[in-house]
């Protein structure tokens, strides 16, 4: 009888795990080794109201022949009432910058405090769908490989291989709606990956299933590089950062005109389908921002306030950092991820030291044989909604540049936004937070009071972007303006009168979309109906399971009570140490067990199998500069030793002109230099 209660509890635990509605068909044995059940501060700083998410993480093998492993970290909401059949893949840019920036500074459930512990981010996107952060290309963050890739087509192919491996691990999710989201240089990655998925869906092989791609969200994206750079001088002038009387105005204007000639040449050959060197090389145009930051520095101010922050023009930084010391919490992320216990908790096979950006990946990834992703947007917009959102304070990927290339772009039968002046106000939580243009499946959203990293500044607002792209908003007249109204999580009114009058897929994806897209709309409607039916069936089944569990619990309690009551008093002995311990152990268990808590025991099964490898203790990466600044890191000056350190993503144009090449002094330099090809000659170089 002494083993009955523990056995009964394990039985109940098994039933509860099997009752999770959207986890049907999962293989716990396969996924078990990727479970994340603990992190520094997880159980101390995350309150029951916040709820601990269900987490899986690890390095998935995608190409054994090159030892290529992609690191992923997945977050799911542990609150069963808010579970959705939606998967969001998040990518950061660089190239070569880790998506852990997104996970721990932007859209994930946690931020990192100064004690290198997790604390709650109340604007996490995992409340709107399972979100998976992936370090890619290979070599980025915790991902690793014996070889590095060089072009955007490879990015797409590698990610498709990752998705195959991911869905082998989580086969129950293969029918989920899929969205891709990211920022900065991910504006190149995401369109290429999305296009590859759509092409794959059209030529499936036997046994393959369609990936239900529903849309892409690109924040402050580096989509049309030279067109974006052409916006720098107008942006500075329009925001009062420089004027025509500045002594360097003529010099800046001359460089702006040089860039304009390059853009004109690109426009003249835009549709010929050829990769032109003058389009994939953007160093001439990017030099404008380098000069602007130099010429506008305020030497009379404090040393750390002399340069305009290129990621948020309302902030200041030291020169030549100019924003690369931002955001402030970035200094907590690296030490957190470099803790050996955290590496083990994230199930790393290779205990690789984490760096925010990998210079070797950036140097190798030239993208000289790939047309910029702006060319792919029209084809994507034929099948899925494309959302381009921008923080209004960003310089490096500013809104003016995005609108400039969109107004030239032809998609779905028209050029640019036809009604550019017909702006739609975006209202969130009774506040106007931005405006949007939305036509023919492409939307542009300008978000007030936010930077290059919108989710960092406005986490709650950024999460509502998911509501916009999925149609979970109300269309209203607010203060005399047409407005799309979104709400804090869970507070949207659910009556028919308040629901969005444009609920059909054709209007949800695009209020002004033409009838020529009816086939796409019909397909989306069918998929939505199917998903709804599936959810309903799953919900009913889950309720039956839960009812059965409750009945079993009552039965178990009754059996235990009856068995003790029926014992003769002569055989009831004083509890021994062992029985006392059992009693305390069982009665000390939590009665209201959360999903993530239930799975804590899995960590114990693996603890004895973990490696004893230590952290690779090397110096932080240093940079000595580059001439070709396209998509590369900007060197950041160290005031004490006149050295340069890694930039966060897309600081490519801010470099010392006297510096010839990047030399990364990080843990990567202790490894053998990766083989790569010279994009211009295709010859192997070391």
Curated annotation (Swiss-Prot):
Pfam families: Peptidase_S10. Glycans are attached at residues 85, 122, 441, 449. Residues 565-686 are cytoplasmic. Residues 489-519, 570-590, 627-686 are annotated as: Disordered. It comes from the Eukaryota. Keywords: Apoptosis, Carboxypeptidase, Glycoprotein, Golgi apparatus, Hydrolase, Membrane, Protease, Signal, Transmembrane, Transmembrane helix. One of its GO terms (cellular component) is trans-Golgi network. It is found in: Golgi apparatus, trans-Golgi network membrane. Its EC number is 3.4.16.6. SUPFAM superfamilies: alpha/beta-Hydrolases (SSF53474). The keyword Protease applies. The chain crosses the membrane at residues 544-564. Residues 504-519, 576-586 have a biased composition (Low complexity). Residues 1-19 form the signal peptide. Residues 491-500, 627-641, 674-686 have a biased composition (Basic and acidic residues). The active site is at 184, 394, 452. GO terms for biological process: apoptotic process; proteolysis. GO terms for molecular function: serine-type carboxypeptidase activity. It catalyses: Preferential release of a C-terminal arginine or lysine residue. The keyword Lipoprotein does not apply. It is a single-pass type I membrane protein. InterPro entries: AB_hydrolase_fold, Peptidase_S10, Ser_caboxypep_his_AS. Belongs to the peptidase S10 family. PANTHER family: PHEROMONE-PROCESSING CARBOXYPEPTIDASE KEX1 (PTHR11802:SF190), SERINE PROTEASE FAMILY S10 SERINE CARBOXYPEPTIDASE (PTHR11802). This is Pheromone-processing carboxypeptidase KEX1. It comes from Candida dubliniensis (strain CD36 / ATCC MYA-646 / CBS 7987 / NCPF 3949 / NRRL Y-17841). The lineage of its organism: Eukaryota, Fungi, Dikarya, Ascomycota, Saccharomycotina. The gene is KEX1.
């Amino acid at each position: 009888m002494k083993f009955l209660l523990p056995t009964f509890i394990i039985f109940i635990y098994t039933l509860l795990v099997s009752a999770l509605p959207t986890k049907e068909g999962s293989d716990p044995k396969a996924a078990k080794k990727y479970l994340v059940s603990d992190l520094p501060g997880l159980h101390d700083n995350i309150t029951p109201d916040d709820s601990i998410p269900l987490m899986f993480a690890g390095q998935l093998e995608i190409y054994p022949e090159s030892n290529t492993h992609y690191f992923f970290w997945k977050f799911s909401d542990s609150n069963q009432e808010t579970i959705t059949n939606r998967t969001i893949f998040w990518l950061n840019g660089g190239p070569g910058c880790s998506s852990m920036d997104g996970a721990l500074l932007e859209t994930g459930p946690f931020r990192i405090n100064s004690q290198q512990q997790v604390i709650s981010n109340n604007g996490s996107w995992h409340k709107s769908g399972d979100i998976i952060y992936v370090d890619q290309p290979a070599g980025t963050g915790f991902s690793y490989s014996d070889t590095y890739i060089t072009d955007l087509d490879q990015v797409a192919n590698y990610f498709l291989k990752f998705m195959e491996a991911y869905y082998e691990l989580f086969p129950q999710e293969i029918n989920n709606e899929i969205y891709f989201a990211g920022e900065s240089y991910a504006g190149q990655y995401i369109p290429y990956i999305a296009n590859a998925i759509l092409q794959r869906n059209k030529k499936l092989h036997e046994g393959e299933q369609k990936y239900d791609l529903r849309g892409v969200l690109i924040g402050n994206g580096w989509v049309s590089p030279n067109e974006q750079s052409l916006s720098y001088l107008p942006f500075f002038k329009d925001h009062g950062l420089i004027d025509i009387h500045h002594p360097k105005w003529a010099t800046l204007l001359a460089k702006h005109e040089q860039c304009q000639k390059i853009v004109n040449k690109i426009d003249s050959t835009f549709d010929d389908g050829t990769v032109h060197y003058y389009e994939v090389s953007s160093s001439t145009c990017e030099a404008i921002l380098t000069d602007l930051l130099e010429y506008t520095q305020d030497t009379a101010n404090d040393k750390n306030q002399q340069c305009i922050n290129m990621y948020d023009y309302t902030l200041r930084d030291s020169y030549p950092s100019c924003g690369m010391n931002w955001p402030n919490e970035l200094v907590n992320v690296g030490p957190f991820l470099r803790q050996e216990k955290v590496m083990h908790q994230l199930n790393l096979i290779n205990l690789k030291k984490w760096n925010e950006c990998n210079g070797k990946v950036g140097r190798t990834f030239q993208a000289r044989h790939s047309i910029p992703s702006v060319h792919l947007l029209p084809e994507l917009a034929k099948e899925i909604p494309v959302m381009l959102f921008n923080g209004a304070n960003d310089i490096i990927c500013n809104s003016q540049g995005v609108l400039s290339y969109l107004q030239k772009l032809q998609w779905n039968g028209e050029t640019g936004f036809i009604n550019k002046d017909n702006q739609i106000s975006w209202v969130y939580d009774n506040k106007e937070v931005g405006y949007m243009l939305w036509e023919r499946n492409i939307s542009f959203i300008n978000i007030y009071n936010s930077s290059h990293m919108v989710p960092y500044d406005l986490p709650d607002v950024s999460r509502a972007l998911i509501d916009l792209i999925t149609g979970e908003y109300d269309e209203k007249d607010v203060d005399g303006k047409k407005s799309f109204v979104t709400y804090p999580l869970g507070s949207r009114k659910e009556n028919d009168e308040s629901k969005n009058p444009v609920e059909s897929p054709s209007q949800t994806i695009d209020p002004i979309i033409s009838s020529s897209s009816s086939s796409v709309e019909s397909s989306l409607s069918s998929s939505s109906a199917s998903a709804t039916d599936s959810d309903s069936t799953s919900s009913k089944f889950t309720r039956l399971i839960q009812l059965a569990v409750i009945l079993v619990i009552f039965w178990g309690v009754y059996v235990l009570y009856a068995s003790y009551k029926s014992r003769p008093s002569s055989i009831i002995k004083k509890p021994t140490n062992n029985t006392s311990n059992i009693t305390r152990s069982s009665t000390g268990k939590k009665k209201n067990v959360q999903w993530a808590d239930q799975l804590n025991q899995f960590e114990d099964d693996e603890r004895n199998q973990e490696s004893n490898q230590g952290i690779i203790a090397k110096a932080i990466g240093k940079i000595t500069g580059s001439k070709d600044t396209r998509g590369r890191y900007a060197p950041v000056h160290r005031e004490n030793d006149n050295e340069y350190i890694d930039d966060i993503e897309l600081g490519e144009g801010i470099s010392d002109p006297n510096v010839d090449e990047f030399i990364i002094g990080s843990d990567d330099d202790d490894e053998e230099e990766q083989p790569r090809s010279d994009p211009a000659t295709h010859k192997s170089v070391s």
